[in-house]
């Protein structure tokens, strides 16, 4: 395994990616990565697309692929081929930050090995420590809340290996359709599982099926999601915006900002809701604040350019 690194606050994404890249001889650390995609320490979320952006723009000799709807078998196949794999999952914090805090958060985990006889993965956990032993069933339970996303970073000469392991999942549309069906079967297994409904919504958003996605998200919210969930996943903002459900969008972005006042994604989508209602000054203020929270947030820069270009 690569040399383990202890994460700074809210920095599991850059730290896990740094350990991953060091596996291939890269010479940087979490600060190198965070300086581009998370310039402010208070930024509590780094999403998969931001990690992808870093590798593609700063580490051109490695490639980055991510897919959803994964399973234990595909993780093992990558590891057996000598390729570590990174996932995003649930995490239980050991302290509360407000009254009745459910202490739920998101976390990245870098998997570097497995033992089939004992049914455990080995993970390099930037918060807990190196060489953590994680039972297969526990991993799947924690992984489900993030649509079972998996990330593979690899040298360009390993592309054929990665393609053969992914098989039809190399095609992103096929992969999403598979994840959509997996979410539906999770719902059948337990109709009261909010993550299954949320994943269904997210996979529907991928196919621009916004009205159906909004219904699935409604169900997830009605059953009950963790308090910080919208700090990390933004599909509902898109579904409500594109299906014209602005009241829901305002309610949800306000709730997200109550929990995470510097969430650039919630600010962005509240800005778009304001724009759709013709409140240009409020929209511009939201977009500017989003950019202030993350000066490298290109979606907010795009939004400002769009509004200034279409007053």
Per-range role (PLM):
Residues 1-74, 80-81, 146-173, 192-193, ...:
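Cysteine-nucleophile protease catalytic domains, especially the papain-like/related folds used
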Residues 69-124:
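Active-site-adjacent substructure of cysteine-protease-like catalytic cores
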Residues 98, 102-103, 112-207, 212, ...:
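Noncatalytic regulatory segments and standalone regulatory/sensor domains
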Residues 202-211, 218-273:
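Alpha-helical adaptor scaffolds
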Residues 284-311:
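Terminal, low-structured helical/coil segments at or just beyond the last alpha-helical repeat
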